[in-house]
C-alpha cells in the first residue's frame, strides 16, 4: 500500500497544522495518551498520483486547499515488516483565516481534530521527543532545515 503524508505549513505566519487522532497502536501498548499529533495522511487510491492524494487528504482532514506542494522524500517506513511506501510533503497553505475544528470523512470513521501551532513550538516538541509519530518528526526537522527556501518562493 502507498500513502501520502503532508505537513501543512504557512510560511507567512510560520505555523503548521497538525491533526490529532485516536490511534489503536498506542492504546494497545497501554500508552496513557492514545490521541496523537500527526501530519495529514491518507492512502493513495488506485490510479491516483501521490500529489493528488496529498491535496485531497488535506482538504478531507483539515478543510483547506494546498497552494503548493513540496516533496520532502519517499520511502519505506518499515521495510522489514511491510511493503507500505510513504510519499512525504510540505503543503504550503494559508492559515490566516483558518479555524481549527473537527474534520474527516464520516464514512471512513474519521474523527480528526486540527491544531494550528507555531513552528518553533512544534520544533521544540520534536527535539524534546514529545512527537511520537516518527514521520512527523522527519517532516518537522526537514522543515527546520529548509523553511527559508520555502519562504522565498
Describe the role of every protein-language-model region.
Residues 1, 7, 12-56, 106-108, ...:
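Conserved Nudix-box catalytic region and its N-terminal flanking loop in Nudix hydrolases
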Residues 8, 90-92, 116-118:
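Short, well-ordered beta-strand micro-motif
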Residues 11, 44, 66, 93-94:
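Hydrophobic pocket-lining residues within nucleotide cofactor-binding pockets
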Residues 32-35, 46, 71, 79-81, ...:
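Nudix hydrolase/Nudix homology domain
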Residues 58-62:
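Membrane-proximal helix-loop-helix units in multi-pass membrane proteins
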Residues 63-64, 150:
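Helix N-cap/coil-helix junction residues
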Residues 65-72:
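A short coil-to-beta-strand element that immediately follows conserved catalytic motifs
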Residues 78-100:
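Active-site-adjacent beta-strand/loop module that shapes the phosphate/pyrophosphate-binding cleft
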